[in-house]
Amino acid sequence: MANMQGLVERLERAVSRLESLSAESHRPPGNCGEVNGVIAGVAPSVEAFDKLMDSMVAEFLKNSRILAGDVETHAEMVHSAFQAQRAFLLMASQYQQPHENDVAALLKPISEKIQEIQTFRERNRGSNMFNHLSAVSESIPALGWIAVSPKPGPYVKEMNDAATFYTNRVLKDYKHSDLRHVDWVKSYLNIWSELQAYIKEHHTTGLTWSKTGPVASTVSAFSVLSSGPGLPPPPPPLPPPGPPPLFENEGKKEESSPSRSALFAQLNQGEAITKGLRHVTDDQKTYKNPSLRAQGGQTQSPTKSHTPSPTSPKSYPSQKHAPVLELEGKKWRVEYQEDRNDLVISETELKQVAYIFKCEKSTIQIKGKVNSIIIDNCKKLGLVFDNVVGIVEVINSQDIQIQVMGRVPTISINKTEGCHIYLSEDALDCEIVSAKSSEMNILIPQDGDYREFPIPEQFKTAWDGSKLITEPAEIMA
């Protein structure tokens, strides 16, 4: 009889839920009601972002799937990052601007997606699509525009410019051989162009928050971020769940009924249930035994033993990589070399390039003539080479010394602290291009020795009545 009564009550609850769901499904699409002070529905700014995803992002994803491999995998990550941004914009359209202390936590889902994209590039430096991965990795921080004020649009443009450095390389390699890569470049750059236009129309001076909803917080906002309608890319929100999940849950409750019946049987014993308890003596009581209190202070809570797991993915930077010195296609890869001063590349060809990555306290000699040399993320590295027909680039490095034995037309220094370049007599017409770097010196041969000339790091700019005039600031020793 009791089981029958319980079944009737469950059926009544199920019917009640079905009626409420049916009533909600017939509401007008523009206004889906109000929950906890938040009016559901999609704001015009979110709808506009959905159009961007359905057009530009979808086109980029399609072209990436055509190229497949690492490019496709990377593009899926980009798509996921845009989904996270869409969820954040949905939250902003329903909640007021959060307190400053909550901003970092609310931005964490997007920042983690950006980090994932950049990490993928770092882990696949040997990929033959490395320029594609670099274009995405260098520009994906543009999604951080939601935290930029008062001019988020120019920030996105700056990130777009960072991408063009690598997309130009892609175009150079494939514009005459495989137009699929050209389409890929166009579709990717179009994303950021359209995002700038979107920001200009809906968030000109910074992210626009709701004026009427409750204040966003790590509690209330995450309920929106984790809800079904806010995450998928298509514009229309998903309808409320139908009856099948309801009865699935009921079925799961029935599966657990034996254990629940056993629990009720124990409870029905009343005071007799205490007969199974064991008597605790004074030496087993913490408040009467000082030694137990000392042990208790050292005992960790079992619930805390699982907390380190979320941080475990961050352990990968400490991995020890095997040193690499090999020719892969037309690229010489010199990676993860430490305390090596005997590295020599002698069998070179004009079309080959050398890529030197994450090398420390080492010296590398490249003989013959190569197309270009790139030094990336290196420390205390010495490079000696004969001839380069293209460019020598130094990026994100520290304490680099370069000696030119023959000729090189251009040397580029970017985001580097400490770079000393020894030019030969034949390389005095070399052009040095530098940006965001310091402690740069050019050493010119004179009378059998070298004379050092610092590259300016400080500039002064003045208005001459018609244009800006910029020149190095003279610093007298």
UniProtKB/Swiss-Prot annotation:
Compartmental location: Cell membrane
Compositionally biased spans, kind Low complexity: 298-320
Positions bearing Phosphoserine: 301, 309
Chain positions found as N-acetylalanine: 2
Source organism of the structure: Homo sapiens
Full protein name: Adenylyl cyclase-associated protein 2
Record GO terms (molecular function): actin binding; adenylate cyclase binding; identical protein binding
Main location: membrane
Membrane-traversing stretches: none
Membrane topology (UniProt): Peripheral membrane protein
Origin: domain of life: Eukaryota
GO cellular component terms given for this protein: cytoplasm; plasma membrane; postsynaptic density
Family assignment from sequence similarity: Belongs to the CAP family.
A single BP term in Gene Ontology: actin filament organization
Function: Involved in the regulation of actin polymerization.
Disease: Cardiomyopathy, dilated, 2I: A form of dilated cardiomyopathy, a disorder characterized by ventricular dilation and impaired systolic function, resulting in congestive heart failure and arrhythmia. Patients are at risk of premature death. CMD2I is an autosomal recessive, severe form characterized by onset in infancy or childhood.
Gene: CAP2
Region named Disordered: 225-261, 274-321
Span of domain C-CAP/cofactor C-like: 317-455
Taxonomic path: Eukaryota, Metazoa, Chordata, Craniata, Vertebrata
SMART domains xrefs: CARP
InterPro entries referenced in this protein's UniProt entry, alphabetically: Adenylate_cyclase-assoc_CAP, Adenylate_cyclase-assoc_CAP_C, Adenylate_cyclase-assoc_CAP_N, C-CAP_CF_C-like, CAP/MinC_C, CAP_C_sf, CAP_CS_C, CAP_CS_N
Protein keywords: Acetylation, Cardiomyopathy, Cell membrane, Disease variant, Membrane, Phosphoprotein
Record's compositionally biased regions (Pro residues): 230-246
